[in-house]
Amino acid sequence: MTDTVIDKIIIESKKAVGVECIDKKGRRFSLKTTKEVILSSGAFGSPQILLRSGIGPETGIKRHGIPHKHELPGVGKNLQDHLEVYIQQKCILP
């Protein structure tokens, strides 16, 4: 399943039951589960998937023609990527 991206989460009866995917050739397909859906796409990717799924602030979602499924006002707000840089230097003088 390389070169495949998640377009949105499939929600049925207010429960996440799977994901809709797009492969490198543009073909759409669904993957469903009987257990749980874990979203882990980073600081920018996770809110993007949630918003495309209809999860987030109603006004922003409906403006883009996406059916609103769950009100969650904080989605897509306060976006920050938490970059870290480690520098090690050997000191030759005390």
Locate each region found by the language model:
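Glycine-rich loop(s) and the adjacent beta-strand/alpha-helix scaffold that form part
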Residues: V5, I9-P94
